[in-house]
Amino acid sequence: MRWERFFDDLEDQLAAEWEAERAALESEAERLRVARLDLRSRLAGLAGEAEGPVALELLDGFVRDVRISAVGADWIAAPEAADARRMLLVPIGAIRGIQVGHGDLLRSARPAETRDRLAERVTFALALRDLSRRRVGVAVGVAAAGEAGAARTLTGTIDRVGADHLDLAMHDAGAPRRAADVRGYRMLPLAGVAWVRVDAGAGAPVV
């Protein structure tokens, strides 16, 4: 028996077994990583990286084509694909589905760089409080109560934001908030808000 050949074969066998074990461990680690992914992480993977527009199916029943530019703690900032001057603030809880290309689908699941930016900890309510503080005119998309599939768009200025709701002074879009021009007031639960739109130059939150 040629011992050199024996030891060579043994080394090859051990190397193959180690490689198989390493691949199995990596595969299991990847499965565990993917199992821990949440929707916010997938959206963060698309922010500024998507090959094309992303179609968001939202709480109000509409589909919005957008380009995700930033992701907060529980919301995204996304200019409309057709008009980048119109910025949508969308709570992640209002998203019912996301249509993406296959490349973007895979990209969103890749391991993300470790970041701890302050913007990523800004909540939806905090972003709305910033709009309220600056008296920025907005459009708010909400589902209509008691009408399945129906939705409304309300325009006005956010007067204040509570823990789970906002107060909207309703007036014409593009007009300043003047008492004489306010048509009425609405308290809107944040859970029922599908999106808030701010036009360019109106002072959208910086994220």
Positions of predicted regions on the chain:
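Short glycine-rich, low-complexity segments
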Residues: 1-64, 70-207
